[in-house]
Amino acid sequence: SWTIDTAQIEQLLRDDTGHRIRALIVINPNNPTGSYVKPGEREQLVTLCRAYDVAIIADEVFFDYALEPFEGNRRFSGERGVLTFALDGFSKTLAAPHAKVGWIRVSGPGDDVREATRRLDVIADDFLPMSELVARAVPPMLATAPDQLQRVRARTQGNLRRLHELLRADTLGVVDVLRAEGGWNVLLRFPSVIDENELVLSLMEHAGASGQPGYFFDMPSNGYLALSLLAEPERFASNVRLVLGAVARALDVSD
C-alpha cells in the first residue's frame, strides 16, 4: 500500500520559519494510486496542521468509489480539529464531466470557520458566481446522485474483478495491478525494461488505443500504466488484452 511520509511533512513545517506554508493539500483517495489517507496518517496530519497553524485542503471527489479499501477510512469533510476545506462536486459524484458544479465544506474551530467563510463568500460572489439556470438544476442532480454512485461503483468494482481474472489467466504473467483502494483508475505494473512511451506508442500503432504512462503521475520508476475502470465491461476486457499484447510484443514473446 501507499503511505504518507508524515516525518518529511513535519520537517517541512518545522523549517518554514517564515510561515509561508499556509495549507496542506491531501487527495483522499489519491489518483491514480487509489490510496486513502489511513486513520493514523489522518490523526498525524491534523495534529501537525493544528500545531503549525496550517489549514487542510482535502480533495475528496473520489471518496465514495471504494474498491479494495483498508478499514477505518474517513472523510476530512467535517473535521473539527483544524481549519479544513473539503472539496467535492457533481463531475465525479454523477460521473458527468460536463456537470461543473463543485462545493467546499468548511469545518474546524469556530472562529477560523467564520473568518474563512466570510472570505470565501467574497471570492465566490466576485469570481465564481453560479447562474440561476445552474442553481435550478442542482436539486434534481442531487436526487439522482445515490443511484448514479451505485451504478458507477458496480461498474468499477466489476471491471476490477475482471482485471484480476485476466491477469491471472495471462500465460506470460509479467503484468500485475497495484492495490487500488478507491477511485476510477488502477495502476498496471509491467517489466521496467519496457519504456512507457514505447508501450503507449505500440498501443496507438497496433490497436488505435492509448494510455497514460506512469511518469505522467511522477511514479518513482519506469514500468507503470494507468488504466480506467469506467469503460463498458466488454470494452474494458478488450483494453486489458490490448495492454497485455503490447507488453508481449515489447518483450518479443508474442504469438
Q: Residue locations for each model-derived region?
A:
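Active-site phosphate-binding strand-loop segment of PLP-dependent enzymes
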Residues: 2-71
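PLP-dependent enzyme catalytic core of the Aspartate aminotransferase-like
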Residues: 10, 14-15, 202-211, 217-255
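A generic structural signal for well-ordered alpha-helical segments
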Residues: 49, 77, 167, 203-204
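Helix C-cap/helix->beta junction micro-motif
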Residues: 51-52, 80, 207, 250
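Conserved core segment of the aminotransferase class I/II
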Residues: 78-157, 252
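Short hydrophobic/aromatic beta-strand micro-patches
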Residues: 105, 187-189, 228-230
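Conserved glycine-rich beta-strand-loop-beta hairpin in the small C-terminal domain of fold type I
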Residues: 139, 154-164, 175-190, 221
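A short linear hydrophobic-aromatic micro-motif
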Residues: 173-177, 210-215
